[in-house]
Protein backbone atom coordinates (compact mmCIF):
# COMPACT_ATOMS: atom_id res chain seq x y z
CA UNK A 1 0.00 0.00 0.00
CA UNK A 2 1.25 3.43 -0.92
CA UNK A 3 0.78 6.12 1.77
CA UNK A 4 -2.04 4.38 3.68
CA UNK A 5 -4.12 6.48 6.07
CA UNK A 6 -6.86 5.59 8.53
CA UNK A 7 -9.88 7.80 7.87
CA UNK A 8 -13.37 8.08 9.32
CA UNK A 9 -16.45 9.38 7.55
CA UNK A 10 -19.59 9.81 9.63
CA UNK A 11 -19.09 6.65 11.63
CA UNK A 12 -17.53 4.47 8.92
CA UNK A 13 -13.82 3.70 9.18
CA UNK A 14 -11.58 3.10 6.18
CA UNK A 15 -8.00 2.41 5.27
CA UNK A 16 -7.33 4.71 2.30
CA UNK A 17 -4.28 4.41 0.07
CA UNK A 18 -3.02 5.54 -3.31
CA UNK A 19 -3.82 3.08 -6.08
CA UNK A 20 -0.99 0.81 -7.12
CA UNK A 21 -1.56 -0.52 -10.61
CA UNK A 22 -1.56 -4.12 -9.47
CA UNK A 23 -4.00 -6.92 -8.79
CA UNK A 24 -5.94 -6.40 -5.58
CA UNK A 25 -5.58 -9.27 -3.14
CA UNK A 26 -9.02 -9.81 -1.63
CA UNK A 27 -7.66 -12.09 1.09
CA UNK A 28 -5.23 -9.40 2.26
CA UNK A 29 -8.04 -6.83 2.33
CA UNK A 30 -10.12 -9.12 4.54
CA UNK A 31 -7.20 -9.72 6.91
CA UNK A 32 -6.32 -6.01 7.11
CA UNK A 33 -9.95 -5.00 7.62
CA UNK A 34 -10.44 -7.54 10.41
CA UNK A 35 -7.22 -6.80 12.26
CA UNK A 36 -6.54 -3.11 11.67
CA UNK A 37 -8.67 -0.49 13.39
CA UNK A 38 -11.88 -2.51 12.94
CA UNK A 39 -12.38 -0.85 9.55
CA UNK A 40 -15.41 -1.06 7.27
CA UNK A 41 -13.43 -1.06 4.05
CA UNK A 42 -10.24 -0.51 2.11
CA UNK A 43 -10.19 2.21 -0.54
CA UNK A 44 -7.60 2.81 -3.24
CA UNK A 45 -7.46 6.29 -4.84
CA UNK A 46 -6.38 6.48 -8.49
CA UNK A 47 -5.55 9.84 -10.08
CA UNK A 48 -7.39 10.49 -13.36
CA UNK A 49 -6.48 14.18 -13.76
CA UNK A 50 -5.95 17.27 -11.58
CA UNK A 51 -9.66 17.40 -10.64
CA UNK A 52 -10.71 13.75 -10.80
CA UNK A 53 -9.88 10.52 -8.97
CA UNK A 54 -11.24 7.01 -9.26
CA UNK A 55 -12.32 5.12 -6.16
CA UNK A 56 -11.56 1.39 -5.86
CA UNK A 57 -13.69 0.37 -2.86
CA UNK A 58 -13.64 -2.97 -1.04
CA UNK A 59 -15.85 -3.89 1.91
CA UNK A 60 -14.09 -5.51 4.86
CA UNK A 61 -14.96 -8.96 3.48
CA UNK A 62 -13.30 -8.14 0.13
CA UNK A 63 -16.56 -7.62 -1.79
CA UNK A 64 -17.22 -4.41 -3.71
CA UNK A 65 -20.08 -1.92 -3.68
CA UNK A 66 -21.34 0.46 -6.35
CA UNK A 67 -21.47 3.35 -3.92
CA UNK A 68 -20.17 4.20 -0.47
CA UNK A 69 -21.08 7.80 0.33
CA UNK A 70 -18.88 8.05 3.42
CA UNK A 71 -16.03 6.41 1.52
CA UNK A 72 -16.35 8.97 -1.29
CA UNK A 73 -16.05 11.77 1.24
CA UNK A 74 -12.83 10.23 2.57
CA UNK A 75 -11.48 9.72 -0.96
CA UNK A 76 -11.98 13.39 -1.84
CA UNK A 77 -10.30 14.58 1.38
CA UNK A 78 -7.42 12.11 0.95
CA UNK A 79 -6.89 13.23 -2.66
CA UNK A 80 -6.73 16.91 -1.69
CA UNK A 81 -4.60 16.39 1.44
CA UNK A 82 -2.08 14.29 -0.50
CA UNK A 83 -1.91 16.65 -3.52
CA UNK A 84 -3.39 14.07 -5.88
CA UNK A 85 -5.80 16.80 -7.02
CA UNK A 86 -5.29 20.55 -6.90
CA UNK A 87 -8.82 21.77 -6.22
CA UNK A 88 -11.28 21.57 -3.35
CA UNK A 89 -13.90 20.54 -5.93
CA UNK A 90 -13.11 16.91 -6.66
CA UNK A 91 -14.95 14.51 -8.94
CA UNK A 92 -14.83 10.93 -7.68
CA UNK A 93 -15.41 8.20 -10.26
CA UNK A 94 -17.33 5.31 -8.70
CA UNK A 95 -19.05 2.27 -10.26
CA UNK A 96 -22.38 4.10 -9.97
CA UNK A 97 -21.01 7.13 -11.88
CA UNK A 98 -19.21 10.40 -11.25
CA UNK A 99 -19.84 12.00 -7.86
CA UNK A 100 -19.03 15.69 -7.36
CA UNK A 101 -17.60 16.74 -4.01
CA UNK A 102 -16.73 20.04 -2.39
CA UNK A 103 -14.23 20.34 0.44
CA UNK A 104 -14.26 23.22 2.93
CA UNK A 105 -11.73 22.72 5.72
CA UNK A 106 -12.64 19.33 7.25
CA UNK A 107 -16.14 19.12 5.75
CA UNK A 108 -16.77 17.26 2.51
CA UNK A 109 -20.11 17.77 0.78
CA UNK A 110 -21.25 15.48 -2.01
CA UNK A 111 -23.97 15.44 -4.64
CA UNK A 112 -25.85 12.14 -4.84
CA UNK A 113 -28.92 11.15 -6.79
CA UNK A 114 -32.38 11.35 -5.28
CA UNK A 115 -33.16 8.16 -3.35
CA UNK A 116 -35.75 5.77 -4.71
CA UNK A 117 -38.24 4.07 -2.40
CA UNK A 118 -40.33 0.96 -2.90
CA UNK A 119 -44.00 1.52 -2.10
CA UNK A 120 -44.59 -1.89 -0.54
CA UNK A 121 -43.49 -2.21 3.06
CA UNK A 122 -41.75 -5.34 4.29
CA UNK A 123 -42.41 -6.89 7.67
CA UNK A 124 -39.17 -8.13 9.25
CA UNK A 125 -39.16 -9.38 12.84
CA UNK A 126 -42.33 -7.40 13.50
CA UNK A 127 -40.88 -4.16 12.11
CA UNK A 128 -42.25 -2.36 9.06
CA UNK A 129 -39.37 -1.70 6.66
CA UNK A 130 -39.03 0.16 3.38
CA UNK A 131 -36.43 -0.56 0.70
CA UNK A 132 -34.52 2.48 -0.53
CA UNK A 133 -31.68 2.97 -2.99
CA UNK A 134 -29.19 5.82 -3.46
CA UNK A 135 -26.85 3.77 -5.61
CA UNK A 136 -26.65 0.91 -3.17
CA UNK A 137 -29.54 -0.70 -1.31
CA UNK A 138 -30.70 0.44 2.14
CA UNK A 139 -33.43 -0.79 4.45
CA UNK A 140 -35.26 1.91 6.40
CA UNK A 141 -37.07 1.36 9.69
CA UNK A 142 -38.98 4.10 11.50
CA UNK A 143 -38.70 3.92 15.29
CA UNK A 144 -40.09 6.14 18.04
CA UNK A 145 -36.69 6.85 19.61
CA UNK A 146 -33.49 5.86 17.83
CA UNK A 147 -31.50 6.24 21.06
CA UNK A 148 -33.67 3.70 22.87
CA UNK A 149 -33.98 1.25 19.96
CA UNK A 150 -31.86 -1.90 20.30
CA UNK A 151 -29.86 -2.02 17.10
Regions found by a protein language model. Name each.
Residues 53-57, 92, 112, 122, ...:
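Generic detector of bulky aromatic hydrophobic side chains
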Residues 72, 114-115:
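Short, acidic/turn-prone active-site loops that include or flank metal/cofactor-
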Residues 95, 115-117:
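Zinc-dependent deaminase
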Residues 106-112:
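Short, solvent-exposed secondary-structure boundary/capping segments
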Amino acid sequence: MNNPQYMSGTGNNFLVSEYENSKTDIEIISIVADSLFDIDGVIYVEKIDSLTVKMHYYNNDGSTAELCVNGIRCVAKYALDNSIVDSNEVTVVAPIGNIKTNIKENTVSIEVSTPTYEKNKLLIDGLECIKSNIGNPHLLVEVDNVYKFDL
